[in-house]
Amino acid sequence: MDTTVKIDARDVNFWYGDFHALKGISMEIEEKSVVAFIGPSGCGKSTFLRLFNRMNDLIPATRLTGEIRIDGENIYDKGVQVDELRKNVGMVFQRPNPFPKSIFENVAYGLRVNGVKDNAFIRQRVEETLKGAALWDEVKDKLKESAFALSGGQQQRLCIARAMAVSPSVLLMDEPASALDPISTAKVEELIHELKERYTIVIVTHNMQQAARVSDKTAFFYMGQMVEFGDTKKIFTNPEKEATQNYITGRFG
């Protein structure tokens, strides 16, 4: 089967001030696959994830060396428009963060900000993305109600729909289910399975069972280094590195 490299990171180093947070990381992520980043707190996995849509640009005194290419383009080149990059690379955060707007306007927000004025198109896109986020049947009769009236799990699926509305090709998820109950978590995981038919998904998770359930490949990070990266089944059943084995068996973390 032909596979296309969607994200190509080459010898990435990253600093917060003098702190060397990521050390020499190289990785290829295939199109329409799910890759999970695991590792103990502070190991660099969320920092690396946020480099893919330049979220770390918002933090002062940071520095990056190496290259990150998406669809062959170095996203840190001077000519790259960060707004366009973030349309293509959507982000879903740890805690649901709906805007203080209606359910409908939460999803429509990105379209309006990007200058879409065709209300019929906006209505169609809102319906499509709410269906895509497995939320439409639950909210179709209350689109004008506040997003804050939704449960935590529904709010997180709304945030996924909001990220999808501007037609990205990559979805980044930073601990997307850590604040949710088990039933809501299962719905988000089921959704991730469905979404990979259309998107490349990179997920950071502390939940190793979740990584094993949803991802095709897993990367284990420790102290700013990527210790091991490979097929998820192999990482969890027969890792090559002792540190990976120790982490997944709970000897540290």
Swiss-Prot record:
The reaction(s) annotated as catalysed by this protein in its Swiss-Prot or TrEMBL entry are:
phosphate(out) + ATP + H2O = ADP + 2 phosphate(in) + H(+)
List the keywords (alphabetical).
Answer: ATP-binding, Cell inner membrane, Cell membrane, Membrane, Nucleotide-binding, Phosphate transport, Translocase, Transport
Tell me the GO molecular function terms. ATP binding; ATP hydrolysis activity; ATPase-coupled phosphate ion transmembrane transporter activity
Which cysteines form disulfides?
A: none
Keyword Transport among UniProt keywords: yes
**Pfam families to which the protein is assigned, alphabetical:** ABC_tran
Q: Which GO terms describe its cellular component?
A: plasma membrane
Q: Which residues form the ABC transporter domain?
A: 7-248
Its placement in the membrane is given as: Peripheral membrane protein
Q: What Gene Ontology terms for biological process does this UniProt record contain?
A: phosphate ion transmembrane transport
Q: What is its EC number?
A: 7.3.2.1
User: PANTHER family annotated for this entry?
Assistant: ABC TRANSPORTER I FAMILY MEMBER 17
Entry similarity comment: Belongs to the ABC transporter superfamily. Phosphate importer (TC 3.A.1.7) family.
Q: In its UniProt entry, what is this protein called?
A: Phosphate import ATP-binding protein PstB
Q: Which gene is transcribed and translated to give this protein? A: pstB
